[in-house]
């Protein structure tokens, strides 16, 4: 499982602070929906009919116990007590209040998690087999390759505005 280092933590914290300011400006009417849309999509936030939806990255589908606890805490405090795991091994919160999203992102950062590039037309979360690294019939552990792709593509300016979303799985 990937472990954040000081660089990762600082990058995610800076992104959380930036999005918190962008959200404040949007709610104050200083940013239009057209201006806010690409900013929220870069941070995993969709506007749906009934409420916003926040998608959280789970790199290669691996969670530690303390990360799962953090997700449960977020679901209890900011949503309806549950999240939805996706086929891409992410988790979605379907009922957060827009004004709470910056706090959710800050809580995720404390658990070494984020929502960067989980929506919009970019390279999405890289997935692998849920038994990667322990399967008896595995020829090679795909997780190091997933991590190389994740580091290479995350926040890469050439992949921020693709014509469509791009999904990668390494088996």
Q: Which functions belong to the PLM regions below?
A:
Residues 1-54, 66, 70, 74, ...:
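Iron-sulfur (Fe-S) cluster-binding modules
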Residues 27-31, 51-171:
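Small-residue-enriched alpha-helical segments and adjacent helix-cap loops
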């Amino acid at each position: 499982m990937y472990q954040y280092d000081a660089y990762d933590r600082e990058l995610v914290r800076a992104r959380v602070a930036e999005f918190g300011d962008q959200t404040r400006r949007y709610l104050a009417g200083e940013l239009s929906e057209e201006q806010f849309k690409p900013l929220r999509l870069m941070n995993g936030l969709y506007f749906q009919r009934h409420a916003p939806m926040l998608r959280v990255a789970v790199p290669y589908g691996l969670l530690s116990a303390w990360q799962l606890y953090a997700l449960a805490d977020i679901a209890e405090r900011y949503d309806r007590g549950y999240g939805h795991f996706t086929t891409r091994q992410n988790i979605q919160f379907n009922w957060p209040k827009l004004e709470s999203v910056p706090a959710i992102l800050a809580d995720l950062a404390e658990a070494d998690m984020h929502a960067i590039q989980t929506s919009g037309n970019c390279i999405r979360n890289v997935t692998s087999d849920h038994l990667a690294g322990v399967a008896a019939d595995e020829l090679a552990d795909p997780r190091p390759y997933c991590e190389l792709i994740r580091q290479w593509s995350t926040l890469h300016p050439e992949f921020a505005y693709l014509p469509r979303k791009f999904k990668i799985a390494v088996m």
